[in-house]
């Protein structure tokens, strides 16, 4: 699933080519994605001018001069593809929704597994939307701090990995960036969240911010379906230190015999990757 850096990259690409433009034509080819499309979606979008873009967690918000906001979610394998004026759009049988602006710019949502979402809401009611209302703070925002994390985690008797994947704790994180941040912070993914001390909370906040900023600068991580709106791949997968690297050497360790490399752990059906030397297992915290 595209995580915060990928969604931020997509949002920025859309903003670059669509901000200030007027939607001339809208087409819905399949309305049965994760949720049904609004019945009046086409009528409310056609003729509207795009006035701004935002991202909340893994959701893209497109604000319109009509007072509405168009919400897009890429789901498990969705992507946005832009065609600029004069380009020939590349047909894709999994494109379920698209719109064109008056200058010929085309924006399509391609979603093979149909776990994505498209919705329309009054802009004034964004915070109360059912998909946004319970989200935690943005990890790159001011509210996300060592004090916030310490207070929230003190009540969590789950693993720190599970806590960080909970979108009510912090918004937008997923498996890749949680694994990378925990490695940088030196925290084992199976540690109980409530056992972290203040110094570890502070390191973790810093690690999350650093990983996300670096990933955004690299255009995200291209894993299977993800590409940027212009069709280019992201590059942060080349900077992964532990994710997907089980059996390979830890970049921060001297190697055997002290460390035999990155290990994989399954947690709640998801793979976690860690270095057993840099991230001491529970019960061996130094």
From Swiss-Prot:
GO terms for biological process: base-excision repair. Disulfide bonds: none annotated. Signal peptide: none annotated. The active site is at residues 2-3, 58, 270. Its EC number is 3.2.2.23, 4.2.99.18. PROSITE patterns: FPG_CAT, ZF_FPG_2. Its cofactor is Zn(2+). Belongs to the FPG family. Monomer. This is Formamidopyrimidine-DNA glycosylase.
């Amino acid at each position: 699933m595209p995580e915060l850096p990928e969604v931020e990259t997509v949002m920025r690409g859309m903003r670059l080519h669509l901000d200030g433009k007027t939607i001339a034509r809208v087409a819905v080819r399949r309305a049965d994605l994760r949720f049904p499309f609004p019945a009046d979606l086409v009528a409310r979008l056609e003729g509207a001018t795009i006035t701004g873009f935002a991202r909340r967690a893994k959701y893209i918000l497109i604000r319109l001069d009509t007072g509405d906001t168009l919400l897009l979610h890429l789901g498990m394998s969705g992507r946005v593809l832009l065609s600029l004026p004069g380009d020939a759009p590349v047909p894709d049988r999994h494109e379920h929704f698209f719109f064109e602006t008056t200058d010929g710019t085309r924006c399509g949502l391609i979603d093979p597994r149909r776990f994505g979402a498209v919705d329309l809401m009054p802009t004034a009611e964004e915070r109360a939307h059912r998909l946004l209302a319970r989200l935690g703070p943005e990890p790159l925002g001011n509210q996300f701090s060592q004090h916030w994390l310490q207070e929230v985690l003190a009540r969590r008797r789950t693993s720190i990995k599970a806590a960080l994947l909970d979108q009510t704790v912090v918004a937008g994180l997923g498996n890749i960036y949680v694994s990378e941040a925990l490695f940088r912070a030196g925290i084992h993914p199976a540690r109980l969240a409530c056992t972290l001390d203040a110094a570890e909370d502070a390191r973790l906040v810093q690690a999350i911010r650093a990983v996300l900023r670096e990933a955004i600068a690299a255009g995200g991580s291209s894993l299977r379906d993800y590409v940027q709106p212009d069709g280019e791949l992201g590059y942060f997968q080349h900077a992964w230190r532990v994710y997907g690297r089980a059996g390979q050497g830890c970049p921060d360790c001297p190697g055997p015999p002290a460390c035999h490399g990155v290990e994989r752990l399954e947690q709640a059906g998801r793979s976690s990757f860690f270095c057993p030397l840099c991230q001491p297992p529970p019960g061996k915290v130094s």
